[in-house]
């Protein structure tokens, strides 16, 4: 029996937008429009269709192990105010719109991510799951394909207990395991420091994404951040990789241009081409505690993150 499922076909094609559906149908010798209608949700693939598609998709890089579990990504920086939470919420929303099932984990005691998504006073939150063995990670549906594990200031007390507890670094990883099969992506919004919570997040992750404001005050701590990533990789999570760095709050001036070029020439990993510009809509959406796409879906700010999402998806397919 063919191991390929309709869900995996859809996931693979969403991760590979360059593949032409009509070409796949022709190579697999299945009726024209079969795959296109499946992507549109108007029909289902039969076992015969899946069997015919399997060798064709395999030729283009498909394997059964690609989408067994979610890819867990920590969004990190040692400094606050560099667009980390905005990137987490906006990237998650953009992925969800493309049909991927996304879980956002608020691991910042300030709870800004939860507040942006309209969860101001969570009754069940991440801290309770981390401190109590029998308590599962809370998962709240925010919108279609987008879910949240919320937090507030209670998480600060939890961090102190995690520092003192045996296996504290493993708590988040263990709590995520039961839900990984339900999602395509898990994005963790880390606190603006290199503390126990950030280490726990990286230990639970496949990779991390760095957000960086191109100003000296933000760039100065980049080496310390990368050193901490290497410490986690060496001592806790050998599979951890850096997906890359995305510049945020970018202004069109010579100072930002010079800093960006310096960073690009010095870091040993990808710097994404898409930059998140310094736009007033980002500030307005933060004041109103609203995701940028909900605040102004047609704005340049929302388009900025949709473009980054497209580039990020293309990158993920390459590394897989």
Identify the function of each model-found stretch.
Residues 6-7, 12-15, 22, 32-33, ...:
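P-loop NTP-binding core
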Residues 26:
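Alpha-helical residues within the helix-turn-helix
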